[in-house]
Structure formats: structure tokens, C-alpha cells
Amino acid sequence: MRNWRWLLLVLAVLLAWLQYRFWFGPGNSGEVMMLEAQVAHQTQDNEGLRQRNQALAAEVKDLKDGEAAIEERARSELGMIKPGETFYRVVEDAPLPAPASPETAAPAQQAPASTDPVDHP
């Protein structure tokens, strides 16, 4: 009977020590949850960067292999045209200012109030 008590005491101390390490020791459950959240965030960032890299790789491949992409960039960014083409630029007139109505023009014609900081009786 006495051996059972010692065994039970040793097991209780061992359980208490393991629980302490689980909750408060190095690599505790809170730290593990924080690291899992960081891993999830980093995975999300990596996926975005992977998609960006794929788009850039496709653009590089298109620029190396195809003339259509180079021609499109030359036309849109540099304003270039092919020989024999005529370039037309359409410039719209600036909108005319709206005429001032008599109500809005009247306050502007009034004399400004005195700017003298001293009050006169």
C-alpha cells in the first residue's frame, strides 16, 4: 500500500511538471499558436509573391519571344509609329467656366469689413 502512495505521488509530480512545461515552459502552447499564425501569414505572402513572379516571368518570356509586346510598349509608352502610318492626336477643348449668377456676384462687390483689430465705440 505504501508503494502505491509513492508511485501516485511521483506520477502527480511528473504530471504537474509536464503541465508546467506545456503552459509556461519553452515552446509552450501560446508560443506554438503564435508561430502557427506567423507560418500561415508567411504562406499567404509567399503565394502572392509566387503569382507576381509568374506574371513577371510571363512578361519576360513575351518580351523575349514576341514582337507584339515590344510593339505595344513602343506605341503606348514611347509614342512610336510604324513607317507609313499617320499619327493623329485628338485634343479636346477646355470646358468654359460657368457664367456667374447675379446672386453670387453681388457679395463679391460689397466692400470688405474693417480689418482694424481695435474696436471703436
From Swiss-Prot:
Keyword set includes Repeat: no
A biological-process GO annotation:
FtsZ-dependent cytokinesis
Q: Identify its membrane topology class.
A: Single-pass type II membrane protein
Positions in the Periplasmic compartment: 25-121
Q: Which Pfam families match?
A: DivIC
Cytoplasmic topological domain residue ranges: 1-6
Q: Which InterPro entries does the record match to this protein?
A: Cell_div_FtsB, FtsL/DivIC
How would you summarize the oligomeric state and partners of this protein?
Part of a complex composed of FtsB, FtsL and FtsQ.
The free-text function statement in the UniProt record for this protein reads: Essential cell division protein. May link together the upstream cell division proteins, which are predominantly cytoplasmic, with the downstream cell division proteins, which are predominantly periplasmic.
Name of the protein this chain belongs to: Cell division protein FtsB
